[in-house]
Amino acid sequence: FTFAVENAYLPFNYIDAETGEALGWDYDVFNHMGELMNFTPVYVPTAWDGMIQATADGQFMIAGDGITITSERDEIVDFSNGYINLAQKVLVAADNLMVMSIDDLKSGDYTVAVQKGTTNYEFAVGELGEDKVKAFDTFDFAIAAVISGDADASIIDETAGLGYMGANKDKVKLVGGDLTSEQLGLAF
């Protein structure tokens, strides 16, 4: 059984910086599936931007990675039942006092860092326009841009935002209300 993981989406799948161990909810679930069904999972680190199509093409049996269930994606892959409902939120540097909501991002001269190919990217472009959006290959890079000041904010799933807050203590925070409500599932 091959499982596609990105290893860059806290808390779903990531590499522990101190131990080098692959951790997260996806690993816990896939390992448990292996125990129940008597197989050893084979994890294949995969770039996000090709993961869903590669799963549709049969390169992987299942893809994890906090995949939002959308009608467009459902046309090429099947999904499990949703395993979590979450909201998209605005994430900013902890010392940022200027951006407190999506409205601030809309009205000001701000740059928003997001991962390309995600519903967060689609939302940011739809609400703010492409000129305000910087697309990155992973959310790790997008969050690093916020922390370094190369971007003013990110649009991120709340659960992942909390994961990045835990991993970057006192460096980032979530602000404002819920932007959307989404359901995540496993793709196969």
Predicted regions and their residues:
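Extracytoplasmic small-molecule ligand-binding "clamshell" domains
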Residues: 1-66
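Short, well-ordered beta-strand segments
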Residues: 2-4, 91, 111-114, 154, ...
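Extracytoplasmic
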Residues: 7, 17, 24-28, 36-38, ...
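Solvent-exposed loop/turn segments at secondary-structure junctions
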Residues: 8-11, 48-51, 67-72, 95-98, ...
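Short helices/loops that flank or line small-molecule/ion binding pockets
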Residues: 32-36, 44-45, 49-62, 76-78, ...
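Flexible hinge/capping segments at coil-to-helix
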Residues: 93-110
